[in-house]
UniProtKB/Swiss-Prot annotation:
InterPro entries membership: FeS_biogenesis, FeS_cluster_insertion, FeS_cluster_insertion_CS, FeS_cluster_insertion_RrpA, HesB-like_dom_sf
Annotated residues for binding of iron-sulfur cluster: 52, 116, 118
Similarity-based family: Belongs to the HesB/IscA family.
Biological role: Required for insertion of 4Fe-4S clusters.
Protein encoded by which gene: erpA2
Name of the protein: Putative iron-sulfur cluster insertion protein ErpA 2
A family per Pfam: Fe-S_biosyn
Keywords: Iron, Iron-sulfur, Metal-binding
A biological process from GO: iron-sulfur cluster assembly
Molecular function GO labels: 2 iron, 2 sulfur cluster binding; 4 iron, 4 sulfur cluster binding; iron ion binding
Cofactor note as given: Binds 1 iron-sulfur cluster per subunit.
Coiled-coil intervals: none
Quaternary context: Homodimer.
CC cofactor: iron-sulfur cluster
Length: 124
C-alpha cells in the first residue's frame, strides 16, 4: 500500500501509512470498477454527519481527484479521502469481507469511541 498526496508540481509524493486499504478490499474495488467499464474510476471514502451514532461512512465512485484529496493506492487501485474526512480516518483499516452474513466493506476505525450495531455509523 502506498499513500500519495498531490504536491505543488502535481506529482504524487509517498507519505507514511495513513490508512490500511487491504489487498482484499482493493481487489473488490477493482472488480467493481471493471464492471462499470471506466478504468478512470477511484473509490472515494468519506465521513458525513448522520447515522444513529453521529457520523457515518460513505463510499462513492469518482473519476475526479480534488487538490486536497489523499490517495491511498493498493495493488493499483486508488482510494480517495477528502480533507474533512481525514481527521476521522487516521489509522483506520478498510477491508472487504465475504462470509455467511453477506459481503461488505468493513472499516475498523481506532478513532471511533462507539459504533452502531450495523457498523455504518460511529461517534468520536
Amino acid at each position: 500500500m502506498e499513500l500519495l498526496q498531490p504536491s505543488a508540481d502535481a506529482a504524487p509524493v509517498p507519505l507514511p501509512a495513513f490508512l490500511d486499504f487491504t489487498p482484499n478490499a482493493a481487489a473488490k474495488v477493482a472488480a467493481l470498477i471493471d464492471a462499470e467499464g471506466n478504468p478512470q474510476l477511484k473509490l472515494r471514502l468519506y465521513v458525513s454527519g448522520g447515522g444513529c451514532s453521529g457520523f457515518q461512512y460513505g463510499f462513492a465512485f469518482d473519476d475526479q481527484v480534488a487538490d486536497d484529496d489523499l490517495q491511498v493506492v493498493t495493488d493499483g487501485v486508488t482510494l480517495l479521502i477528502d480533507a474533512m474526512s481525514r481527521q476521522y480516518l487516521a489509522g483506520a483499516r478498510v477491508d472487504y469481507e465475504d462470509g455467511l452474513e453477506g459481503s461488505r466493506f468493513v472499516i475498523q476505525n481506532p478513532n471511533a469511541q462507539s459504533t452502531c450495531g450495523c457498523g455504518s455509523s460511529f461517534s468520536v
